[in-house]
Amino acid sequence: MTTTVAEYSDILYEVKGAVARVTINRPDKLNAFTPHTVKELTHAVWSAGADSEVGVVVLTGAGDRAFSAGGDVSVENEDTFVAGDDSFDKLMKELYRAFRECLKPVIARVDGYAIGGGHHMAYVTDFTIASDRSVFGQNGPRVASPAEGWLVSHLWTVVGMKRAKEIWMLCRRYTAQQALEWGLVNAVVPAAELDAEVARWCDELLALSPTVLKLIKKSFDDSTAHIREEQERFTILNQVNPGFFASGEQTEGSQAFMEKRKPDFAPWR
């Protein structure tokens, strides 16, 4: 069994046996990610996909407090969301494209909070295995952090339209057991058994025909490709509110979060 380790600053990447393990390594920030983090994640996923020694990819977060708390609110603004090649919007779309087009199974190993962008990653991967102490949910409307297009609408293919809207629009928190019942995760186990459960899933997948697995994964992806392609032709935020970042609404959301107070969004209704 060989082990390969690649050097990154915000993530850890290790290939051991036929499993590539990608770890968001910002535990002091609950594994919240910056645009740079997303770039590294994307590079790692593509690397795993191109590696003939890799059969399964496992995505996780460092520590036992969070899989990922989503985008780092302290660096989120108009420039980081919509400006140029380093925008959150563009970079996240590239990451989810990597998850889809890496035709090897991608498993999200969730231990702790999977919130906001961390929740996105948990439900767009092929499988999600969670510890029983994990918590799932969205955060965008609560902190005025915009998300749009396929990233949002894909959730209805996982849990159904009504529940997807509830998750996205109400920002409630859901236990691992609730997530299992709704189809957000595939399995829930005690935290002490999480690595063994993930390893079991990896072993099962590695025993199967890699080409047939690729065909199945691409078939699922192609079934919704027309929706994704249509939504990626334009920016929905610019249609709904082209002056969103200049309006002060996003600033109020992020400042309220940093100040640990309830935001006042009344002026923007």
Language model: regions and residue ranges:
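Conserved CoA-thioester-binding segment of acyl-CoA-metabolizing enzymes
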Residues: 1-60, 97
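Terminal low-complexity tails and localization/encapsulation signals of metabolic enzymes
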Residues: 1-8, 255-269
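Glycine- (often His-adjacent) and acidic-residue-rich active-site loop
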Residues: 5, 61-98, 114, 142-144, ...
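C-terminal long alpha-helix characteristic of the crotonase
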Residues: 27, 129-134, 185-232, 265-269
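CoA-thioester-processing core
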Residues: 95-101, 109, 115-169, 182, ...
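Well-ordered beta-strand positions
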Residues: 127, 166, 170-172, 178, ...
